[in-house]
Structures are given as structure tokens and as C-alpha cells.
Amino acid sequence: MFLAAAAFLLSAPASASQGDKEPVYRDCVKHCVRANCTGARLRGFQSTQPPYMALTGWTCRDDCRYQCMWTTVGLYQAEGYSIPQFHGKWPFARFLCFEEPASALASLLNGLACLLMLLRYRSAVPCQSPMYHTITAFSLVSLNAWFWSTVFHTRDTYLTEKMDYFCASAVILYSIYLCCVRTLGLRRPAISSMVGVLLILAFTSHVSYLTFVSFDYGYNMAANASIGIINLLWWLCWCWLNRRILPYWWRCGMVVLLLHGLALLELLDFPPLFWVLDAHAVWHLSTVPVHFLFYSFLIDDSLHLLNTEKPGVKLD
């Protein structure tokens, strides 16, 4: 429902942080680039760089920034100061080409869980079920978002950051459409069609503003959070109204409450344990099991709709 979406509502990286503002860090980067990233030294770096690093776009300057980050962290620790952030992020120990190994792994696990449960849904629910195609499309949108989340946590670039944020917004907006179809659209298809058009226009405007006007992290977070709250209240209202009719309603309510409760983990925002596991990674990891509960609800609900879709029978 909101699995891919909820994982992005609170995070809003800054363009500059305490660590990368430090003169020692900036001087280190300048010296490293001058000494290693020109002429024969640059060719030497490129010839010895592992293929997986080159394929993921790691440059000599990027490597200088990485090495100087740890030099600065070491100085902070030696003086007894708290660990600073660099370019809006905590310092992470790189593993192979993965900038944030734990978050990348967690995003991959979420994607695999989503794929596994989509396949289970398609094998358990006939395509004649009223929600079949809407749920399948939502799952594909979610899979795309988890793919780009994995890519972004593997390698943070201008493109991967934008795709991560835009695809997360797509999931949030599509989750509104999914909610609308399930609660209103089955009896009044015109309403869901109208809402679908409005959501497409909203997504187009949102992406256009962030791309061509200003990539405003605060605006992006506020917009996504607002839609997420609407989604939360809409689903909880539906669950409450159907609690005596649908025996599986609690699964939907549990998923909604779990996701928004688990999102509070992001507020902890501590330096990564062992330079790998931070609050964001813990948050991502905690959402993996929720896919199974969510799709259990979707399967039961889709089968219920299939069995009650008869002339004169009201769809809940």
C-alpha cells in the first residue's frame, strides 16, 4: 500500500553539512585532486580502478572526497567531537561499489518481497477479480520505486537521486488511486477515472517543478507527507466502516499503522553503527515483513470481491 512510499517521507538530504564545510576537509580534497586526478596520475588511477567502480561512475574526485571524509572523521574522533555529516549524509563505509550497503540491501529485500508476493497474488487470484489489474499495476509501480531506491543507495548521483524521489512520489500518488478504486471506484467507476486523471496531472506538475524550477527537498517532503496522511486516514476510515463485514479488515489497518509507526525510526537519525547501519537502513529493513501481511489482505479482499461480484450484490 504505502511500502515504497513511506520509506521516503521524512528523509530530506541537505546540500551541505558540517563535515564538508570544514576547512580541513576542503583542503584535503583540493590537495588530493591536484595530486591524483590530472595527467599521468589520473590515467594510473583509471587503470587500477576496479571495473565495478568504473561502471557505477566513481571518479577520481569522488574517491578523494571519500578518503578525505574519513580523514576528517578521524580528526573529529581524536578531538572527542561528535561525528559530522557530509553532503547531507552520515559517513558510511563503502563496500565494493555500494555507498550505503545496508540501505541498498534493505531496498533490494523490499523489492524481492514485493515481487514474491505479487507472484503469489497472481497465482492465487483470478484475473476476473475487480481489483486484479489495479493491484498488479500498483505492485509494478512499487517494484520500480524499490529498484531505484536500491540504485540510489548503491550510488548517489544527480540522476539516481531524482529517480528515487520521483518514483517514490509515483507510489504515493498511485496508492491514493488504489484506495479510491477499492473504496469508491468499484461502484462508481467515473469517480476513480476522474481521480486518476487528477493524480496524473499532480504527478506531472510535481516532477516538472522539481526538475525545471527548483529541487526543493522541503516542498517534496511536505507534498508527499500530505498525500500520505490523506491515504492513511482514508484507509483507516474504510477499515472502521467495514470492521463488521470483512473478517480480514484488521490486516489493512495493521499495515497502515505499522508503516507509519515504523517511520518514526527515521527520527532517531544516529551515526551508522559499524559505519554501515543507520536509522534509515533499520527503517527499510523493518518494512520487509509488512509486504507479506499487506498482500495477505489483498489476496483475501480480491477473492472476496470476486465471490460477491454478482448482479444485485453490493461491493463493500
Swiss-Prot record:
It is a multi-pass membrane protein. Residues 20-97, 153-165, 216-220, 276-278 are lumenal. This is GPI-specific phospholipase A2-like PGAP3. Keywords: Glycoprotein, Golgi apparatus, GPI-anchor biosynthesis, Hydrolase, Membrane, Signal, Transmembrane, Transmembrane helix. The chain crosses the membrane at residues 98-118, 132-152, 166-186, 195-215, 221-241, 255-275, 279-299. Its EC number is 3.1.1.-. One of its GO terms (biological process) is brain morphogenesis.
